[in-house]
Amino acid sequence: MSFLGLRFKEVIVSSSGHATTQQEQESSARPRRSKSKFGCRECKARRVKCDEAYPTCKRCQRQGIVCSSAPRLTQWQIETPWLSLQPKTFVNRRLLQYWLEKVSQTLVIDPENNPFSFPALEYIAQSSALLHAIQSVSASHEQYFSANTPIIALEERGKAIACLRKEINQSQHAPNALILTIMLLALAQCADSDTKDYGKQHLFATRAMIHSMLQNTSMLATNGPAIQLCLGMYLYWDMCSSFLVDPCESQGLNSLNISNAVHRMGDWHHPMYGTCSGLLLIMANVGRYCRQILDSPQNRNFVQEAVLEAQLTTWKTSPANPRLGHLYEAFRNHGLIFLYRAGAHAQSSCLMDPDSSEAQESLIQQYAEETVRHLMQIPATSHYLNFQSLPLLTVGSELTESNQSLRDQVRDRLRAIYSLNRLPANLLALRLLEELWDARDRGNPSFWLPHMLQKDWRLLLG
């Protein structure tokens, strides 16, 4: 990989040869009230001082409102000799900088190990599609993915799609650049105002590319880390969308091929999520199964449920740190609660053993409360927040009226996640939870997945 030269702008201090007067000296000696540069929009609108905490200031947190924090960007200059390679491609330096320093950080758990930031410049030099996709997402992110998508974001998205069609047929383009481009197009699309659109066609396109990669034994043998990066990106995306895909449509990859590929990855540390590749595959299979029995309760398979439950409970890894361990336990419990609740929903029209049902409800409550506590062990300033919204929805929906304190923590955390990554799906998930809590408190508890589907929503969370 070639190294690009980075240099920060020199701070220019102007000086004057004129002597200062006593009045000027006294004026300069008086303390000056510094003006906030990073105060959130809410505090500025109220003309009050903001403590500039990120992603949520204390005032917004106390009032229980969304905090629209200003991004922390540094001035930088980058020597980019590769720009001359693509004279027909317009590079918006501001949007590119915004991606490198801000937006790309929402895709990883550790900003110091981020292949989607400065290391991606190598691929941007080769892929106009990736550059336009990045500029489109950056333009939308600046405006909190507003329902009125900025014109520049739409223009850049259109250019990205046009370039991508050409690049897919050209073998010299790196697979991770293509898959990142498609993933960003899906992100931009699902952040639009259409709550039914989760970027399905982009998911299926990526699935076809991964299938082709897994069939290519020479590629698997020679491009280890690059292939693992691509596979991990797909695994996480597939897990988040597995229950959104209609069961009658195209399903996952060949189970043997994908299982073997994940087994080969082992505990390889993926920059998006760490060492939980195997858990993501299990959770994706849980999501697909839950959607299947939701649509066709008569096809409930107790053997398959037992296998999935055993896979979830026995999965293990060695997380890099305790906070990552808390995130993995939240993922595991999300999968177990999802599986138990879907099974109970499928059998709700049948006679059930009251003792068995009561025991399972107690277990679900235990997992829900335990999971919230796991997630709250992760500070609100951590990049791990970007991967919490899906388990928060699952476990939050199970909290009872007696768990008001935990409900408040879930509310605060979803608002903080929105302030961090600005994806509207986080606020829609909170809205969904408020409806579910209201129904539960009135004696009508409901499973969150059918409730969401009845609203004709397909929220891509995580």
Positions of PLM-derived features:
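Short sequence/structural elements of tandem HEAT/ARM alpha-solenoid repeats
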Residues: 151-155, 177, 197-202, 350, ...
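Short linker/helix segments within small regulatory modules
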Residues: 51-55
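Structural motif
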Residues: 124-129, 172-176, 221-230, 270, ...
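Hydrophobic/aromatic-rich effector regions of fungal transcription factors
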Residues: 99, 117-123, 132-146, 156-196, ...
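Cytosolic regulatory protein-protein interaction regions
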Residues: 2-17, 21-29, 37, 95, ...
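Intrinsically disordered, low-complexity regulatory regions with latent secondary structure
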Residues: 1-46, 56-107, 111-119, 126, ...
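Acidic/serine-rich, low-complexity amphipathic helices located in mid- to C-terminal regulatory regions
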Residues: 103-104, 186-288, 451-462
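Short, surface-exposed loop/turn segments at secondary-structure junctions
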Residues: 144-151, 171-172, 193-196, 218-221, ...
